[in-house]
From Swiss-Prot:
Record keywords, A-Z: Nucleotide-binding, Nucleotidyltransferase, RNA-directed RNA polymerase, Transferase, Viral RNA replication
GO BP annotation list: viral RNA genome replication
EC top class, as a word: transferase
Function: This is the catalytic subunit of the viral RNA-dependent RNA polymerase complex. This complex is involved in viral RNA replication that produces (+)-stranded genomes via a complementary, (-)-stranded intermediate.
Subunit and partners: Part of the viral RNA-dependent RNA polymerase complex, the other subunits are probably the host ribosomal protein S1, EF-Tu and EF-Ts.
Single GO term (MF): RNA-directed RNA polymerase activity
Protein name according to UniProt: RNA-directed RNA polymerase beta chain
Source organism: Enterobacteria phage GA (Bacteriophage GA)
Amino acid sequence: MFRFREIEKTLCMDRTRDCAVRFHVYLQSLDLGSSDPLSPDFDGLAYLRDECLTKHPSLGDSNSDARRKELAYAKLMDSDQRCKIQNSNGYDYSHIESGVLSGILKTAQALVANLLTGFESHFLNDCSFSNGASQGFKLRDAAPFKKIAGQATVTAPAYDIAVAAVKTCAPWYAYMQETYGDETKWFRRVYGNGLFSVPKNNKIDRAACKEPDMNMYLQKGAGSFIRKRLRSVGIDLNDQTRNQELARLGSIDGSLATIDLSSASDSISDRLVWDLLPPHVYSYLARIRTSFTMIDGRLHKWGLFSTMGNGFTFELESMIFWALSKSIMLSMGVTGSLGIYGDDIIVPVECRPTLLKVLSAVNFLPNEEKTFTTGYFRESCGAHFFKDADMKPFYCKRPMETLPDVMLLCNRIRGWQTVGGMSDPRLFPIWKEFADMIPPKFKGGCNLDRDTYLVSPDKPGVSLVRIAKVRSGFNHAFPYGHENGRYVHWLHMGSGEVLETISSARYRCKPNSEWRTQIPLFPQELEACVLS
C-alpha cells in the first residue's frame, strides 16, 4: 500500500505537456491512408487521427469558451426561427409533392394515435425527478429527495396538474399540507426554462434548457409512457445496441442507410406535433412544456415545441422519426429493419431519398457529415463500422496530464480496433512511451474502460479508488424535510435505499483483486514473450 505522500506525488505528476497532444503528433508522423470513409484507401487510424482531438477544448483552431457558447445560442435561435416560420407558413413543398407529403403524414398520424392509446389513463404513472440542475435547484442540491422536500418550481399552465400529481401520493400530499398549507402556495411559479450550454466540441457548445422542477417531473412521466409504447414496436430507447448492430450490418452489404440530423430536438415545430399527435395528448404536452425563456433580460417565446433538457423531448423526437420512417416504408412497400434512437435513424437504402425529402419538408436538417447512405461506412449511436470492422474513435475531451488521464489514454489505445485479440502494432510505440510514465504498481489490470490502473500483461498490482462519502439514514441525520423527501422518493423508486453520495478529488489505493481475463495484446508484446 502506498503511503499518502507517495500517492499524492504520483497523482500530481507535472508532465509539462498534454499527452493528448503528444498522441496526436505521433499519429501525424505516421504514413497513413485517407481519413475519408468513402475513399478507396480509407485508413481507420487516419480517421482516429482526425477525430480524437475534435472535442479537446483548447487545441488547433478551437474557439474560446465564450465564442462556443455564443455560437450554440445562435444555432438554437436559428432552429427556433425556422420553427416559427413553419408554424405560420406550413411545410416546405419545394422538394416533395404536397399530395405525397400529406399521405405520409396521415399514415404517420394514424401510427402515433395507435401507439399512444391509453395515454390519458397512465400519464402520471411514471413521473419522477431527475438528478440534474433545474430552475429551482443548483446541481449540488439537485438530488430528487431535495426537490421533493423543497418548494419546487412550476409554470402557471402546469400548476394544477402538479398539484394533482402530489395528491396521488398520500405522504407527499400530507407533507405539502403540513409545510406549505394551502395548495396555492405549494410551488413557486416561474415564467419558463433557463438557457445554458454544455461542451460539445472545440468549435461549438450544445445549447439546452433547465426546466422548472414540477414541469420536469410531469414531462418525465409522459416521456416514460412514450418510451414504453415504442418498445412494443421494436424501438427500445433503453438500449443503443440494436442501432449499433444495424450499423454493422449496413457496413457489410450497404443495404441500410444511417441518417443523423442536425439540432433535431430543437427543430420540432409546434405545427408538426399538432398534426401528428392526438388532440388530448398534444394539449397535455403543451401544458407541461415551457413556452418561454429569458434571453439577455428579455422574455422569449419559443417557436419550437420543446428543447433539449425537456423530460419528454428525446422520446417525442424518437416517436416522430419512427412514425415518419415507418409510414414511408409502408407507402413504398419496403420491408426490412428500422432502427430509431433519438435522431439516429436507420432505414433500408431504398427509403433514404424519400425520407430525406420528408424530413427537410417538416423542418429537419440532415447532418451530412454523419449521414451515410452509400459505400460501406456506417455510424449510429456512437458505433462506427467499415466493412464489419469496428472503427469507433476515442476522443480526448480534456488535457491528458494526470495519472488517471494517462492510464485511460493508454487503455483506449490498447483497445482501439482490435482484431482477433490483437491491438494495432502501429500504436505500440506511443503506448509504451506513455506506459513508461506510470508507476509499475498500477500495471496489470484488464478493464479497458478504467482510468484507475494500466491494462497490461503484467501481474495485477494496485488500483486507484476515488474517495467518496455516502450518506444514508443509518450514518447521517437528515433534516426533517429531507427525511420526508427521501421517503417520498423511495415510494417512487419502489425499492432500494435513498442515498446521497459526495465525491471528492482525492484517491486511495487498494489491491487489484479483479478476476484475470484475456486482454488485447500488441504483436510486439508477443514477440517479447517468445524471446524471453
